[in-house]
């Protein structure tokens, strides 16, 4: 059998060794909740803020424009709901595809219940 080729990087991706090295202490020793009020936690909040500053600087953004989420579904929901909120005075019609990630489709179904008109494009129309 030949070498395995992993083709599902949209779902998960291997962590680079240098990233693992940097994160390992926070998985094993420094795992305090950064939102906690105790010292163990506040140190982690400081580390997160340093990371936020580095990312913002590399993107030419402000640190307060950088948000961290728990994963793809949370990010999808947040992005879609944020766009809806930002453009609520422009109308209530959203166009998406029928093959979107379930996190997007579930949020679209929720928005339909709130009175939004949805158009789901099929692959045939794309």
Regions found by a protein language model. Name each.
Residues 1-124:
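Pyridoxal 5′-phosphate
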């Amino acid at each position: 059998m030949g070498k395995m080729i992993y083709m599902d990087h949209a779902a998960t991706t291997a962590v680079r060794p240098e990233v693992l090295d940097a994160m390992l202490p926070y998985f094993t020793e420094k795992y305090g909740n950064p939102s906690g009020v105790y010292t163990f936690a506040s140190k982690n909040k400081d580390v997160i803020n340093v990371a936020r500053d580095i990312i913002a600087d590399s993107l030419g953004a402000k640190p307060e424009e950088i948000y961290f989420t728990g994963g793809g579904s949370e990010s999808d929901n947040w992005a879609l709901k944020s766009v809806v909120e930002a453009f609520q005075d422009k109308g209530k019609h959203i166009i998406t595809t029928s093959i979107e990630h379930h996190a997007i489709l579930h949020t679209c179904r929720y928005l339909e219940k709130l009175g939004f008109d949805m158009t789901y494009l099929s692959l045939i129309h794309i």
